[in-house]
Amino acid sequence: MRKFDTKVQLLKYKVLREVARIAFDEGEFSLANNFNDIAKTVTSDKATMRCCIYKERAIVAERIKLACGGNRANPNIIEVIDIACDECPASGYQVSHDCRGCIAHRCESACRKGAISFDENQKAHIDKTKCVNCGQCAKVCPYSAISNYTRPCEKACKIKAISMADSEENPAQIDNNKCINCGACSYACPFGAIMDKSFILDAIRILKDSNKGDGFNVYAVVAPSIASQFVYAKLGQVVTAIKKLGFYSVVEAALGADIVAYSESKELAEKGFLTSSCCPAFVDYVKKFYPKLTENISHNLSPMAAIAKYIKETDETAKVIFIGPCTAKKAEAKQERVAQYVDCVLTFEELQALIDSSKYTPLIHQGLNIVIAGAPNAGKSS
């Protein structure tokens, strides 16, 4: 049984599935004429998530654009859907109604910036122009009446790559110079206003051009976590479904890890101190925030790229599509040293949408249910 943590994930899945279905059945060039039809397909006749059905469909249209590859001029994988952003109110420490107006005024004593004042009822107030969000007032309040209200996206981004643009009335913006494409903000946003670009159309184009292996062979390199991703089906069923899509073979990325481990052990013995090159988000993090350690990053390819290189050395006309859980892998595949080996990257949710969209591929198992974890209808057919 396929479960989604939130309705945001379910909506994203529906958009990806419909985009893939049209690309499979009618060709990707027909997508431009089907934007409105897709928007109507994945939403109800009445507004269920936004102020009106028209805004819902406008937001879905933006999701469709990202499902089709997004803004190609923007090198970042993670993008903000401006119209979907709720422009959350200012973050920071705020005094709640739990303030009892005590006479101890510990919050005032703890604040070195003079940001705490009191009204005629002795209720505390914080001057946001003076507050530096140090949190000292919250620590000493005996009633825990001071809380730190943080925007979900900003809270999720530990490297502070996302913020509100200019003022509170503008949508969130991502600093590409800081962003490592980890996707934490995308998962955290309750409005689904942050999304990763999809290359599902690139994958479909490769599969179609291969003509079921008559033109060239398409290899699916899968991350080890595939074993726990499709918990409602046996791994063999998932592999069969992947091959039904037109893949020639399914290869474990773990084989690439063995190749990297062998080479990396020699580099480690030589350098003495070495950091991993396996995770592109981590590598990007080191380069952007700890540039002095760049030379200590392993010079080996990641397991994904290593096994893809091996495949292309043994099958010169091969195309390789990596399938895993990580959005940062999409950014890695665009790197010059990796792009020659990896032709496309899909996430597991995109693979699910691809499987469910293809008329050539039966559902992984009979009676597949799509539900949201914790929802009232969880466990029931939908």
Predicted regions and their residues:
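Iron-sulfur-associated redox domains of electron-transfer enzymes in respiratory
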Residues: 1-69, 195-355, 362
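Ferredoxin-type iron-sulfur electron-transfer modules and their immediate structural context
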Residues: 1-140, 144-156, 160, 352
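Gly-rich Lys/Arg/Thr-decorated short loops/hinges at beta-loop-alpha junctions or inter-strand turns
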Residues: 86-94, 117-125, 164-166, 184-186, ...
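Short coil/turn connectors at secondary-structure junctions
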Residues: 90, 106, 112-113, 121, ...
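Transmembrane alpha-helical segments of multi-pass membrane transport proteins and ion-pumping complexes
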Residues: 101, 105-110, 140, 188, ...
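ATP-binding Walker
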Residues: 102, 180, 378
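Conserved Radical SAM active-site core
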Residues: 127-128, 133, 143, 152-220, ...
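Conserved G1/Walker A P-loop phosphate-binding module
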Residues: 356-382
